Amino acid sequence: MYHSFFFRTFVPSIYFAIIRMHLSKAQIKWVRSLQLKKNREAEGVFVAEGEKCINELCNAFELVLLATPDNATSTEIEQMSSLRTPQGTIGVFRQPASDTRYPTDELILALDGIQDPGNLGTIIRTCDWFGIHDILCSHDTADCYNPKVVQATMGALARVRLHYVDLPQVLAEIKAQGTPLYGTLLEGTNMYGSNAIPDKQHGVIIMGNEGNGISSAVRQHITHPLLIPSYPADAVTSESLNVGIATAIVLAEFRR
């Protein structure tokens, strides 16, 4: 069977230890319950689906349960899945211990109230592409272990660390160290200008909430407000960009 071959090939150390017998009704019910944040937090685990995503996450997280056609029927996998079209494999992983440590000598991202799981997942995946390894998140940012977030990252969660912190306080501390804090604002400086970004290798890039942008508590700490210009400048365009797309545009400029 394809699934057996995949997991024996790519995760051989855990395949036989985890797939021993058919999943019980209690296990199936438990996996389904993990769609709720309170249950994920209580158990200290999260769920991923699809062979590629699971294989990527096995490199960074402890796999505690694996459901495949070898130990669960298609109906049971559908019951456990949070996807409209289940991908046939489901993994439950141990959440790592909370870590508030973050680097201060490289470029990092800060998210202020990003609430849509799809946006957060896309941002994590984009950070992985552009070599951003740490993201500071306000406490009201979406849970990075939400199944929709995990799926949208396509395994990037294995390489990008998220730190849920008191964002205004942490940014104040970083600012006091002389670190530049960049934020996307409508009244910002055109980010393609020659002096808009003095240091592309070091600093914090702040992205705001989908509907309200960067909060006033966070905005006061920005040292370099940036504008993503629309083209042509005097044309009527959309009011704003999707935050995932905006993040990709900004990171691309910093890495250019």
For each predicted feature, which ranges?
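Intrinsic-disorder-associated, low-complexity terminal segments enriched in Asp/Asn/His/Tyr and depleted
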Residues: 2-3, 15
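Short, positively charged and aromatic/hydrophobic N-terminal segments
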Residues: 9-18
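RNA substrate-binding interface of SAM-dependent RNA methyltransferases
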Residues: 18, 103-188
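Boundary-proximal intrinsically disordered activation/regulatory segments immediately upstream
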Residues: 18-66
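Short, hydrophobic beta-strand segments that form beta-sheet elements in well-ordered domains
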Residues: 46-48, 62-69, 180-186, 205-208
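Glycine/small-residue-rich loop that forms an oxyanion/phosphate-binding "nest" at active or ligand-binding sites
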Residues: 75-93
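Structured adenosyl-cofactor binding patch, chiefly the S-adenosyl-L-methionine
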Residues: 91, 129, 144, 151-156, ...
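Active-site/ligand-binding-proximal alpha/beta "capping" segment
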Residues: 183-238
